Amino acid sequence: DLRMSRGLGDVYKRQIVYKGMFLVGQLRTFFRDLQDVDYESAIAMVHSRFSTNTNPSWERAHPNRFIVHNGEINTIRGNADKMLAREETMSSPMLQDELHKVLPVVNTQGSDSAMLDNTLEFLTMSGMDLPLAVMITIPEPWANNDTISQEKRDFYQYYATMMEPWDGPASILFSDGDVMGAVLDRNGLRPSRYYITNDGFLILSSEVGVLEVPEEKIVLKERLHPGKMLLVNTVQGLSLIHI
């Protein structure tokens, strides 16, 4: 079925995206390569919930190319309109007359998650590191925040001239295959909790108890704080950064 095949998933140099309109327990049965005992990955992002603001479809099913998302982006219409308006002034010395082939940046027929994913993909494919792109699109509250450094305040003020916040109650996980991170909206309206185990695993989820972990293996229990980012670099090992 052609319509279904467009939403089955994606394959990249460092990532494979599996998706479908079924329960988590059915995923391995549907995609048989997941049954192979030799199949290994340092990163796994799983999204399992029903759509709230859009009708369910293969194309809108999570994960997206870079993110999984629990929540809503309430500013999505303004965000999408701004991205489309920027296309009028876009230029590229590399693409030149072929720039039109990468436009539009956002697919306005997609979900709010998909349009944010479109934007992050555009920024990273333009040479920006994914964590930086996430900080620009989902900034912490900085304008009247006396607890952040002047350097970070200057960072947000600079990029605020180029990108408006994608705002709303949201917990977002992101990965490019090498780094994996999580960010919580500035108001902390979605839960995100994580464990670190003594055998080197980091487990983050919106609910406690998603995976059964013996208490004696847990070396750290923590939650993601509003507007903050958790980042792990798998190339450098389990380096945990709380930005």
Task: Write out the residue ranges for each language-model feature.
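C-terminal, non-catalytic interaction/recognition modules in large multi-subunit enzymes and RNPs
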Residues: 36, 167, 177-180, 184-199, ...
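Acidic loop->beta-strand submotif enriched in PP2C/PPM serine/threonine phosphatases
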Residues: 55-65, 215-222
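Short, flexible loop/turn elements at secondary-structure junctions
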Residues: 47-52, 72, 174-176, 208, ...
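Single conserved hydrophobic/aromatic residue that forms the stacking wall/gate
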Residues: 2-8, 12, 241-242
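Active-site-adjacent "gating/activation" loops or surface patches in catalytic cores
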Residues: 33-56
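Phosphate-interacting basic helix/loop segments used at nucleotide- and nucleic-acid interfaces
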Residues: 151-170
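Conserved catalytic micro-motifs used in adenylation/nucleotidyl-transfer and phosphoryl/amide-
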Residues: 44, 57-73, 77, 164-204
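Conserved catalytic alpha/beta cores of large enzymes that bind or transform nucleotide phosphates
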Residues: 74, 80-81, 88-152, 209-240
